[in-house]
Amino acid sequence: MEKFTVHTGVVAPLDRENVDTDAIIPKQFLKSIKRTGFGPNAFDEWRYLDHGEPGQDNSKRPLNPDFVLNQPRYQGASVLLARKNFGCGSSREHAPWALQQYGFRAIIAPSFADIFFNNCYKNGLLPIVLTEQQVDHLFNDTYAFNGYQLTVDLDAQVVRTGDGREYPFEIAAFRKYCLLNGFDDIGLTLRHADKIRQFEAERLAKQPWLNNKLVG
């Protein structure tokens, strides 16, 4: 998993409340057994004018010019600004996969659905909770300035604006540690690979009838 320390990027304002996971990545794209390739279909039903299906050549599909991510001023955005209850609806880890593979590194909103919130951390995507008033200010700034950027400093736990304002945010110490070091669940486990191998060797010495090959 890619480390997250300090990130500066263009902000895209998604000015809708209760954006659910089916809007983030529609159900027909969940059939894949792979973990990659979801970025082109993030917000598929809002982003394109036709109905999307797996395997389509998205470069040939008609774009919805009114959708925020299709507007030239927000191209290359890596910080998503959203409204309350972002990521609600059915549980699907494909939602943070799609957002991350689109290019987002952080999402700022007044609140998130719990399961989506947790899934973001597991996939290197930083969900940041600010107050509704703070989010309103950021929406106003994003609309007012073309190419508006924010800096997210995870170590300092602040969101910085170009004019020097800082918005502190909370994050659990363990989650912060994992993001700063680029550790997902597998990465955390592999840090203890030597101890795991030692335990397995000792167990097999005591219980040789369980003689399976060691992993790694």
UniProtKB/Swiss-Prot annotation:
**Pathway membership, UniProt:** Amino-acid biosynthesis; L-leucine biosynthesis; L-leucine from 3-methyl-2-oxobutanoate: step 2/4
Q: Does the keyword Lyase apply?
A: yes
Disulfide bridge positions per record? none
Please give an example of a GO cellular component term from this record: 3-isopropylmalate dehydratase complex
Q: Which leading EC class covers this enzyme?
A: lyase
Gene Ontology biological process terms from the UniProt entry: L-leucine biosynthetic process
Annotated EC: 4.2.1.33
Q: Which is an annotated Pfam family here? A: Aconitase_C
Q: Which reaction does it catalyse?
A: (2R,3S)-3-isopropylmalate = (2S)-2-isopropylmalate
Superkingdom, taxonomy of origin: Bacteria
Q: What are the record keywords, sorted?
A: Amino-acid biosynthesis, Branched-chain amino acid biosynthesis, Leucine biosynthesis, Lyase
InterPro entries the record matches: 3-IsopropMal_deHydase_ssu, Aconitase/3IPM_dehydase_swvl, AconitaseA/IPMdHydase_ssu_swvl, IPMI_Swivel, LeuD
Molecular-function GO terms, alphabetical:
3-isopropylmalate dehydratase activity
Can the keyword Hydrolase be found in this entry's annotation? no
Q: What does this protein do?
A: Catalyzes the isomerization between 2-isopropylmalate and 3-isopropylmalate, via the formation of 2-isopropylmaleate.
Q: Which family does it belong to?
A: Belongs to the LeuD family. LeuD type 1 subfamily.
User: What is annotated about its quaternary structure and interactions?
Assistant: Heterodimer of LeuC and LeuD.
Q: What is this protein called?
A: 3-isopropylmalate dehydratase small subunit
What is the species of this protein? Burkholderia ambifaria (strain MC40-6)
Gene encoding this polypeptide?
A: leuD
